[in-house]
Amino acid sequence: LKTCLIATDYTCSPSVKDSALDRYFIPAASLSGDFLGGGITPERLRACGIPVRRMFRSGVRKEDAKRAFGIPVDHRHLVMMCGSMGCGPIMSIARRIARALPADQDLTIVCGTNKQLFGRLSRRFCGVNNVHIRSYVKDMALLMDSADLYLTKPGGISVTEAASMRLPMVFIDAVSGCEEYNKDFFLRTGGAVTGQTPREIARTSLKLLSNE
């Protein structure tokens, strides 16, 4: 029986060094040193990227995706997502972005299963026509197809999905551990940018959305 590991973060997780599998499929050749340092022999490594579902490579036209979510096709669209539980300083960043968001740009915030956050944001932005608050989104791929910029925490799968769609990213509030390594990998390779504070993150997002 052959066994393998498919790494879904851009680092060698601590438990990998305790394993003895036939193959280790890793996100990038540049990460080989991390796995070799963990005791994995070179012949067992295969650099092949992180697999994502086909829907994240479907290539739906951005205009059609925007129509599906009620976003005007001539508007720039920022999608803000912080995991299925809606973690991170979303409220602080959202307030700063919404305050300076031009009328021809839209912000969609996905709260996931965080009902308290959904309620707070819905009340805060009630009546703001270009700020849209959503709870759990089933067709996340279609929403990402509608986006011109993606504001997210650096989870291994979610950032790979965005990268496969060639979607520009701004990172929010990485959780200590694997997400820090994911963040560092994408910042180093030019796949994303970030800021040190909610103010910096909001300012960077607005500049990118306006192509400044």
Predicted features along the sequence, with ranges:
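Membrane-proximal helix-turn-helix segments that form the acceptor-binding/catalytic region
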Residues: 10-23
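A nucleotide-sugar donor-handling region in carbohydrate enzymes
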Residues: 22-84, 113-116
